[in-house]
Amino acid sequence: MMTAKAVDKIPVTLSGFVHQLSDNIYPVEDLAATSVTIFPNAELGGPFDQMNGVAGDGMINIDMTGEKRSLDLPYPSSFAPVSAPRNQTFTYMGKFSIDPQYPGASCYPEGIINIVSAGILQGVTSPASTTASSSVTSASPNPLATGPLGVCTMSQTQPDLDHLYSPPPPPPPYSGCAGDLYQDPSAFLSAATTSTSSSLAYPPPPSYPSPKPATDPGLFPMIPDYPGFFPSQCQRDLHGTAGPDRKPFPCPLDTLRVPPPLTPLSTIRNFTLGGPSAGVTGPGASGGSEGPRLPGSSSAAAAAAAAAAYNPHHLPLRPILRPRKYPNRPSKTPVHERPYPCPAEGCDRRFSRSDELTRHIRIHTGHKPFQCRICMRNFSRSDHLTTHIRTHTGEKPFACDYCGRKFARSDERKRHTKIHLRQKERKSSAPSASVPAPSTASCSGGVQPGGTLCSSNSSSLGGGPLAPCSSRTRTP
């Protein structure tokens, strides 16, 4: 093996590197003193005079002429020496390799350029038992192939040569999660060092194993479904293993209070028209129209459940917030005719009918079983609900007998009728002689400031109909 001097590392390719070298970069005088012998007992001479050219694919053809002196190559006894005339050309094949600077320990600490001599051939194949041939043989399966003219060719392909002159990929990060992806680089370094020291050949490029497929459960386990993250109890709630009717948030229904039923429209219609209204009355009722009615249910069990749920005796009795205006006023009905006293403490009311007592007890309990279907407002009495519904419908069934004005409530019509009656009394009490002459400027068919009527209305006092309400003023 012949080793050249250490030179500066030039980042060029093989062919470019050969063209840049001058002819006298390694003179014979310096090479004889520092190089080692290629073959045993061979004299170092000067046949290395010039380089004729570079063959393709990284092949270096060096024509060795015997201008200065002959080269005697004694071979071992097992091989016959080949005579080499002075005027015959020798062909050499060599390989240049520039070792990059590895970040760690390198198997080439000196960083030199190695020239591996494959052999000297002259028409026949050189001995394969030499150290250089054996080292190249151990490095590649088919190291050399000799052509008809004695030119040695390399068996390695161009990608292998490109890998030798290109820096290797950076080492992968060795972390806990990447331990399965890449192997320890010390195994490659130790193998390369052993191969170099034993066979003096370049180690094969380290081949990193490809990453494991993503389907490997050791690397990235595929989650089959989300229930793997949840405990068994949550899985049952998510997937509904208890059945399709399972509620996500179950809660006891006995703790909730059932809202009061709506008053049927038939009850409201019957009450408005003055007909009998059927309904479920409270305890002790004698068939009155008070009490809630079941919406759309006629079974006895539902009626009993509703009656028990809305039983006034089950609710606490509270004192009346607004006391009576005349609490000590004697009733017109004798006491023995009012057998239903109020059970609330501090209330001395007595009633002659049980439905009246039931309606009164709702004042203490706050029970309002009648609900408006339009605004969902609750009422304690059905007549209050009926009157309230008329505010939504605009119905005014009560008309005034004197002026024809309509009202939604009978008490409103009664209050309005009193106005006409007071006016009639004033007309009858005023003497006809004391009526002064009316003034057309101030009289508009109404009542004058003195309280007398206009002359236009005096003719109608004798039993005729009263004037419209718009032409009269309200008097206290």
From Swiss-Prot:
A motif (HCFC1-binding-motif (HBM)) lies at residues 162-165. GO terms for biological process: aorta development; brain development; brain segmentation; facial nerve structural organization; fat cell differentiation; gene expression; motor neuron axon guidance; myelination. Residues 127-178, 275-300, 318-341, 412-476 are annotated as: Disordered. The modification N6-acetyllysine is found at residue 247. It is found in: Nucleus. Residues 415-425 have a biased composition (Basic residues). Its EC number is 2.3.2.-. Keywords: Acetylation, Activator, Charcot-Marie-Tooth disease, Dejerine-Sottas syndrome, Disease variant, DNA-binding, Metal-binding, Neurodegeneration, Neuropathy, Nucleus, Repeat, Transcription, Transcription regulation, Transferase, Ubl conjugation, Ubl conjugation pathway, Zinc, Zinc-finger. Ubiquitinated by WWP2 leading to proteasomal degradation. Acetylated at Lys-247. May be deacetylated by HDAC6, HDAC10 or SIRT1. SMART domains: ZnF_C2H2. Residues 127-141, 429-476 have a biased composition (Low complexity). One of its GO terms (molecular function) is SUMO ligase activity. GO terms for cellular component: chromatin; cytoplasm; intracellular membrane-bounded organelle; nucleoplasm; nucleus. A zinc finger (C2H2-type) spans 340-364, 370-392, 398-420. Its main location: nucleus. It holds the Pfam family DUF3446. Changing residue 412 to K: In DSS; loss of DNA binding and loss of transactivation activity. Residues 281-290 have a biased composition (Gly residues). Sequence-specific DNA-binding transcription factor. Plays a role in hindbrain segmentation by regulating the expression of a subset of homeobox containing genes and in Schwann cell myelination by regulating the expression of genes involved in the formation and maintenance of myelin. Binds to two EGR2-consensus sites EGR2A (5'-CTGTAGGAG-3') and EGR2B (5'-ATGTAGGTG-3') in the HOXB3 enhancer and promotes HOXB3 transcriptional activation. Binds to specific DNA sites located in the promoter region of HOXA4, HOXB2 and ERBB2. Interacts with HCFC1. Interacts with WWP2. Interacts with UBC9. Interacts with CITED1. Interacts (via phosphorylated form) with SFN. This is E3 SUMO-protein ligase EGR2.
